[in-house]
Amino acid sequence: MNPSHPAVHPVEAPPTDVHHAPRVRMKDYQGMPGTLGGLALRLGQFCFAVVAFSIMLSTDDFSTVTAFCYLVAATVLQCLWSLALAVIDGYALLVKRSLRNSLVVSLFVVGDGVTATLTFAAACASAGITVLIGNDLRECDQNHCGKYETATAMAFLSWFMVSPSFLLTFWLLASR
């Protein structure tokens, strides 16, 4: 046997078909960042927060109550956060990239947790004031109780859309 010629020759692997490769991995559950479900949740968060913000701004006396000012501030933050992440999710879907970077996922978890907490607290505070004005003081004829209730309900729905995003992203981070 000649030592300069190996007895085993390399075998060329068959080329992979890149056009039919699976786009979503098994661990990509809908609702996680970079999925169509995640984009839908982000757009839902954004829409509900915009509606709550718009309804609250349509009243002329929301600024006299601290809880309503807090609701406006929380929904503005929720709008900005949800829109930014919806753009990132949409881009990830367009270029078929996975958002699995630990730093990115950590940022998403912290941001979702903060905005979810702020939105929920603002909705609860606004609900308390709305009940106080409507049921206890019985001054709905002098105030915009219907608008306050609708804005509060939209804030709760926005929080309801943030919660799955937060839980799924937290699960993604914790499962690393």
UniProtKB/Swiss-Prot annotation:
Transmembrane spans: 36-56, 68-88, 103-123, 153-173
Membrane topology (Cytoplasmic): 1-35, 89-102, 174-176
Membrane topology of the entry: Multi-pass membrane protein
Pfam families reported for this sequence: CASP_dom
Localization per record: Cell membrane
Keywords: Cell membrane, Membrane, Transmembrane, Transmembrane helix
InterPro entries reported in the protein's UniProt record: CASP_dom, CASPL-5
Principal location class: membrane
Extracellular-facing ranges: 57-67, 124-152
Superkingdom field: Eukaryota
Example of a GO cellular component annotation carried by this entry: plasma membrane
Subunit structure: Homodimer and heterodimers.
Family: Belongs to the Casparian strip membrane proteins (CASP) family.
Protein name per the record: CASP-like protein 5A1
Organism field: Ginkgo biloba (Ginkgo)
